[in-house]
Amino acid sequence: KLRGVDDLNNKVEHWLDWFGIQDKRDTMCKDLSKGQRQKVMLASAFIHEPRLLFLDEPFANLDPIYQRKCRQWLLDLVESGGTIFMCSHVLEMAERMCNRMAIINNGKVLASGTVEGLKLNDKENLEDVFIRLVGHSIEEVERQSDENNDEEE
C-alpha cells in the first residue's frame, strides 16, 4: 500500500496508461530507457495528486508529446491552487511555465522575481537575461559558438 493513495491499483493503471508505459509494468527500472525512467519518476510524483511539487529537470528525456502533456498537467495543478518548485536549464520552457523564478549560477542567486520583471525589455528572453547576469554579452557567446562550429568543420 502506498501511503496517502486510495485505490492504488487503479491509480497505477491510470498513470501507466497516461504515460504510455503499460507494457513496462513488470520491467525493472535499470532496464528502462531514460525517457521511460523519467515517466516512472513523474508518475510516482503525480499519483499522489499533490498540491505541492518539487521537480528537478522534469522534462529531461521526454519526447515533445509527453513534455506538452506534463506541462499542461502541471499548469492545471497551478491553476487549481497548487504550487510547483522546479529546477531547469531549459529557460524557454521555464519562461512559458513560471510566474516567478530565481536565476542561479554556481550556487549563487543572481536575480529573482517575475519573468517580466527580470527582463530589461520585451525583446529580451530568459536566455538573454541569464547571459547578461553572468557577465557575458550575447555577441560574445554567439562569437564563441561560431568559433566552435568552425573548429568542428
Feature locations, PLM:
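Conserved ABC ATPase signature
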Residues: M28-L32
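Conserved ABC ATPase "signature" region
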Residues: K1, D6-K24
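ABC ATPase "signature
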Residues: S112-G113
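Conserved catalytic motifs of ABC-family nucleotide-binding domains
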Residues: E49
